[in-house]
């Protein structure tokens, strides 16, 4: 959305994000590893190749140089380094005596089954591990009662699961007693636990890791982050996000078809984005059919939204509005409270916005006769679908690198992608703050350029548009006269 609201650009969310990064030290980014790497990687046929690392490599957190390009030794604007993920030539766990556990938590997301499949097959095919266990229905599956439902994961069970959405392990929200969960891991002989879930899940993973460390048991707890909103700090992409954008574009195109097929038609599409508007912003740019884009990072009033709608109707009889679910939480009164994951319950801004648009059009019926408003909420269809091919590849890469690093003893960390490199980030740092849209960044600039702007002169813009159309007609008329003269 291209609303001219400069005072809102430096929102509290953006400030908090930058302040947090300023307080992070290199020591905070140091990845914990279980002591000892006594076993050679069993993939001996590749042992002499560079895919297997003996030492830790790093990338700069921010590749932008502080100095001018002419500087002989440019220095990054940030002193922070992130540890690169890799397969290791020597590993911590004895593969044939290693048991892997997998748990999926929180809401479902495209790619969950791909991650489960890749972890399982990497453990079996590459490392020949003793067992792979799947814990059912989130952290409940690690409780004393829930552990009775654990299932064995093998090639036959996971071969085709990537064709389907959801998770074959099931999922749930909410914490469990960490002591009870570590008891389960010890009882079943689990050496590595992969936790696939959002920030709440990973905070729970950190507690499990700390309890295991307190007991002195040799267990790696390794996170594969799942956030369809793409709001993970230190990461530029999370699995399922690209698929969500693709499906969101389909919903926007449907809303556009409804809007342009009516006299003063409005299509409203609610997309996922509790605290971050990445899906809404990218879908707006990708579809090139959105006229207003509302995201949590740029809060505006009901009056301003209706002014944007008026501005759009000054030069078109259709309007498509995209709204992220976390936008406009001060527009109405919700039920209050928090869900089992600790997230604040949101009001349904999609329904509220739709009703307010209808009321506005009804109050201005003489100006906008025969107006219609169509509302589309594709959220559950998006998160339940299988991933796109590119997302499936991304899931496989995250999962296989997670197995390689966990086998080498990395623990209390997550796998993430930054600047097209795969890195390890300690869970404590990764979950300390959400990543949000930079309202001064390139993505938001693109959104502003293609959507309605209260700061622009609509009459002048319409006049220029008509003038361009007339010039095109005149050029075509001259061409036709020339062709006619030749006959």
UniProtKB/Swiss-Prot annotation:
Pfam families: PFK. Keywords: Allosteric enzyme, ATP-binding, Glycolysis, Glycosome, Kinase, Magnesium, Metal-binding, Nucleotide-binding, Peroxisome, Transferase. A motif (Peroxisomal targeting signal) lies at residues 485-487. Its EC number is 2.7.1.11. Substrate binds at residues 227-229, 272-274, 325, 380-383. Pathway: Carbohydrate degradation; glycolysis; D-glyceraldehyde 3-phosphate and glycerone phosphate from D-glucose: step 3/4. The active site is at residue 229. The keyword tRNA-binding does not apply. The record marks 200 as: Important for substrate specificity. Its cofactor is Mg(2+). Mg(2+) binds at residue 199. Its main location: other. ATP binds at residues 107, 173-174, 198-201, 226, 341-343. One of its GO terms (cellular component) is glycosome. One of its GO terms (molecular function) is metal ion binding. It catalyses: beta-D-fructose 6-phosphate + ATP = beta-D-fructose 1,6-bisphosphate + ADP + H(+). InterPro entries: ATP_PFK (IPR022953), PFKA (IPR050929), Phosphofructokinase_dom (IPR000023), PKF_sf (IPR035966), PyroP-dep_PFK_TP0108 (IPR012004). It is found in: Glycosome. Allosterically activated by AMP. The keyword Cell membrane does not apply. Homotetramer. Catalyzes the phosphorylation of D-fructose 6-phosphate to fructose 1,6-bisphosphate by ATP, the first committing step of glycolysis. Belongs to the phosphofructokinase type A (PFKA) family. PPi-dependent PFK group II subfamily. Atypical ATP-dependent clade 'X' sub-subfamily. This is ATP-dependent 6-phosphofructokinase. It comes from Trypanosoma brucei brucei.
